[in-house]
Amino acid sequence: MWKIESFLLSKLFLCIALCTAYVAFSSAMMEPGLWLLSRPIVPLNRTSTVFGLTIVAIGLSALSSWLSKLTLNNFTSDDSWDWSQEIVVVTGASSGIGAEIVRLLAELSIKTFILDPVPPDNSVLKNGSVHYYKVDITKPKEVSAAAREIQVKFSSPTVLINNAGVGLAKNLLDENETERRHLMNVNLLSQFTTVQEFLPAMIEKNHGHIVTMASSASYISSPQIVSYAASKAALVGFHEGLGIELVKRYNAKKIRTTLVFAPLL
């Protein structure tokens, strides 16, 4: 019979199970396990014991994932999504990641609106489901005018993808105020503007999705991107606060919020 002599292995399995239990439940559930950890090390000499502990760890991990999914969806479901009726707004979508998002939506014939000061490639607009509005999202009046026109001519958007962003590759002491304010206006403050314009209609219907494009720089900065990293880190707080307000202040549990950490951006 398979025999494990390592005295430390028993502690390893128990630690894995405890960590998973902490995520799935709470620290209170860990007290019995913590007591076991304080006991003298006992060797695992039986295959059944090792197998049992492995199954427990896997089970707790699966339970944790299931509970996390429920939490992210506010413990509710929404079967009303019909992509032939949904309307998506994407900011900064004339190039880069935004353009790719629009391309994928166009392939699915999902009605999509680009808000960008720079026009997209003409080939994109040949798709009847894609529309373009020349909008500087740092100017609230332009955003508001575009939002009203979309709502009047079509309907209220149900998905908002705040994709627009700019970079600034300079040492902090070499930046000037104009550059820094422009970066903050595009990367951070514009998202307050677009959400204030498009979210009320979503709340009214308790149906919608807000996507925030953050970055790996939200957590890991480096030289010459201090301002950029700060703007992206602020989006984490924006996303988390928005999600809480939707549930606690507006009772709009079916409106989803997604935070995207784009690598190398």
From Swiss-Prot:
Active site: 216, 228, 232
Keyword set, alphabetical order: Glycoprotein, Membrane, NADP, Oxidoreductase, Transmembrane, Transmembrane helix
Glycosylation sites (chain numbering): 45, 74, 127, 176
Ranges annotated as spanning the membrane: 6-26, 47-67
Chief site of localization: membrane
Family in the record: Belongs to the short-chain dehydrogenases/reductases (SDR) family.
Protein name, UniProt field: Dehydrogenase RED2
Native source species: Cochliobolus heterostrophus (strain C4 / ATCC 48331 / race T)
Phylogenetic placement of the source organism: Eukaryota, Fungi, Dikarya, Ascomycota, Pezizomycotina
